[in-house]
Amino acid sequence: HFGQMRYSNNDMSAAVYMRSRDWKYNTTTHQKGHNIGADIQNKWLIGKVGITAGANYENENTKNTVGTDSAKRDSGAVFFMTETQIGAKTKMFLGAREAYVEESGSKFCPQFQLLQNIGENENIYLNINKSMRAPNINEQWGTATQLMNPDLKAESGWNYELGWKKKITDNDLLKLNIFHMDIDDRIYRAKDSTSGLNIYKNAEKYRNTGVELSYEKALSKKFSYNLGMSYANPQQKTITSSEWERTDFKFGLNAGIGYQLDKNSANIFANYMTGRVNGTKPMLDINMNVSHKLTDKDVLKLTIYNLLNRDDIRTGSSSGTSGALLEERNWMLTYERTF
């Protein structure tokens, strides 16, 4: 179950939300959890500099039916971003985020982006930022089928992107992106040698360099599609190995089809991953969403995840036959009211 209330007034916006889930397994056990949170942000224009600043807070709680103590966690962040026009063709973004997660501490994450117009409907950009990802509460405190790791730390590191984007026509958009990342304490899934159960651990180092290419096309007022591909070389060092080892996947393909007619819209998205480690089979994940505008203020949306109900391994296979699977086909019905 999910509920959200959002308020917007000119340059200020705020929201409160709640989410409740019940994960059932192929045994007699299941996992329950809920999240509640809020965020607020505002925009200002001081001279020629645009400033966006805000804060957010979230409380997470989870418990399973096998006697594990319930786990709960608070997290929050404050952030700002400035936007400055430098000359007629250059725009600079400069910002930072101070993020805090209980059990993981806090990290200061700066960001710098430069956007340069190099021609009609064509630009290049440079983006450098530091990121932080705290472990999911279930990754740290376990589930009915997974060991807990209270010492699991948040991962953090630097990300670098150099991109090019060109609007070929009013209906065609082409993007090229080259990226590199260096992550400390990267969170990954492994198998415990004693119990045979899965457990999440921290890798000492993680690095990944790759390229992404995407194309978007509007066929008509009703139909559109997008295509994308990626090639990367993700590697990590663990506590048990001082050598760089392959991880995750090398090749990725994605595609989407969109339809829009009057008050109705529909989209199907597909992601395919191959070139994986340990003989893990390719993964195909297809999601769909449908939307209907009931009135000018009311919208009904249906989202279906894992449309084909595949049980492909999503992440963390140490043998090629085990790991975190795609969730079973599930759906979310959303009603939105503007007032």
Short names for language-model regions:
Residues H1-N117, D172-I178, A218, S224-G228:
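Face-selective signature of the C-terminal outer-membrane beta-barrel domain
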Residues T82, L126, R246-F339:
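Conserved C-terminal beta-signal and adjacent last beta-strands/turns
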Residues N9-D11, M18-D22, I46-K48, Y57-K63, ...:
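Transmembrane beta-strands of outer-membrane beta-barrel pores
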Residues H1-Q4, G33-Q41, R73-F79, F93, ...:
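Transmembrane beta-barrel architecture of outer-membrane proteins
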Residues Q85-M92, F179-D182, K201-V277, D296, ...:
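Gram-negative outer-membrane beta-barrel transporters
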Residues H1-S8, N117, N123, N127-D184, ...:
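Outer-membrane beta-barrel signature, preferentially recognizing the C-terminal barrel domain
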Residues G3-N9, A38-W44, F80-T84, F112-Q116, ...:
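Residues on the lipid-exposed face of transmembrane beta-strands in outer-membrane beta-barrel proteins
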